[in-house]
Amino acid sequence: MHVVVPFAADTPKTRLSEVLSPPERTALARAMLADVLSAITATGHVPTVLSTSPLSLENGCSCDDLPSTTPPGLESASDIPVTVDDRPLTAAVNAQLEAAEEPVAIVMADLALATPAALSTLFASGAADGVAIAPGRGGGTNALVVRHPDFRVDYHGASYLDHREHAAEIGAPLESVDSFRLGTDVDEPADLVEVLIHGRETAADGGESRTATRLRELGFELETTDGRVTVARDRS
């Protein structure tokens, strides 16, 4: 299986701009990417990063952000292949699907809670000529496995519904994978709560995930107000 991780290297996570500066958003995005790559490599697959611009995993992430599991067949985790495609997400991913000679998994780089177990379930899902999708909140498509040669993605709007309709049109069996961890992407400030709550459960070594650690380094902590859990930032 060819596992692809799209990554917006130039201006990541703009919807977090009200709580993070551009350099901070870049640092958080790199930490999430490293967590996702670690989870994928722990399943025994070698991921390919589909980046909008040239990206060095060794220079673009701190040493602490590099995946801890060495992918099979690679000398080090920093040797994970990077393919540059500056086209919009839909066009870039469809180019990967068109060129594929084996099943393709597309896993978004902001799935900070992804674990090897959750990904293994996704990778094993779907019919031999079908599609398996882990939907996100609000109708998005957070991860999918494509085994049908004619299936193409369209990430605009409620893409999960569009992908279901497209699969039906081409006669591809579709399986929806119900996963809290793959259904949680980090786009909005409110999403940071889940990272701080579940970050320790995500890390394979029993410590805290790189993403949660980076948030704490930036001064974010959980705060309970009127019975609701939110995040607050200490800038001192």
Curated annotation (Swiss-Prot):
EC class: transferase
GO function terms (MF aspect): GTP binding; phospholactate guanylyltransferase activity
Entry keyword annotation includes Transport: no
Pathway the protein contributes to: Cofactor biosynthesis; coenzyme F420 biosynthesis
Enzyme Commission code(s) on record: 2.7.7.68
UniProt GO BP: F420-0 metabolic process
Keyword terms: GTP-binding, Nucleotide-binding, Nucleotidyltransferase, Transferase
Disulfide bond entries: none
Gene3D superfamilies, per database record: 6.10.140.50, Spore Coat Polysaccharide Biosynthesis Protein SpsA, Chain A
Reactions this protein catalyses: (2S)-2-phospholactate + GTP + H(+) = (2S)-lactyl-2-diphospho-5'-guanosine + diphosphate
One Pfam family in the UniProt entry: CofC
Signal peptide range: none
Protein task: Guanylyltransferase that catalyzes the activation of (2S)-2-phospholactate (2-PL) as (2S)-lactyl-2-diphospho-5'-guanosine, via the condensation of 2-PL with GTP. It is involved in the biosynthesis of coenzyme F420, a hydride carrier cofactor.
NCBIfam families, A to Z: F420_cofC
HAMAP family, sorted: CofC
Family: Belongs to the CofC family.
Subunit record text: Homodimer.
Protein name according to UniProt: 2-phospho-L-lactate guanylyltransferase
Native source species: Natrialba magadii (strain ATCC 43099 / DSM 3394 / CCM 3739 / CIP 104546 / IAM 13178 / JCM 8861 / NBRC 102185 / NCIMB 2190 / MS3)
This protein's encoding gene: cofC
